[in-house]
Curated annotation (Swiss-Prot):
Residues 1-35 are annotated as: Disordered. Belongs to the eukaryotic ribosomal protein eS25 family. Residues 21-35 have a biased composition (Basic residues). It comes from Candida glabrata (strain ATCC 2001 / BCRC 20586 / JCM 3761 / NBRC 0622 / NRRL Y-65 / CBS 138) (Yeast). This is Small ribosomal subunit protein eS25. The keyword Ribonucleoprotein applies.
Amino acid sequence: MPPKQQLSKAAKAAAAMAGGKKSKKKWSKKSHKDKAQHAVILDQEKFDRILKEVPTYRYVSVSVLVDRLKIGGSMARVALRHLEREGIIKPISKHSKQAIYTRASAE
């Protein structure tokens, strides 16, 4: 193997400036989901809407109320407990992480 040819400092600098290296890959910008602006205080209008709409849902959980009614999770949990106490909805499955309800059938 023949010895490498030694370049002068000027030649090395010129080679570096020639742009032989690839530029770094730019990561594509992803669309960011906007922060949800859900209600955190239960006013009379929201309460009336919960009492009117929730009994018509076949499947009721905290996430369903958050998505459809644009309320916070803690407010949705309080509303579900209230509706269960009133007998408007009945539990299907309840444990510490998730509570699933359905509408109470008229008997």
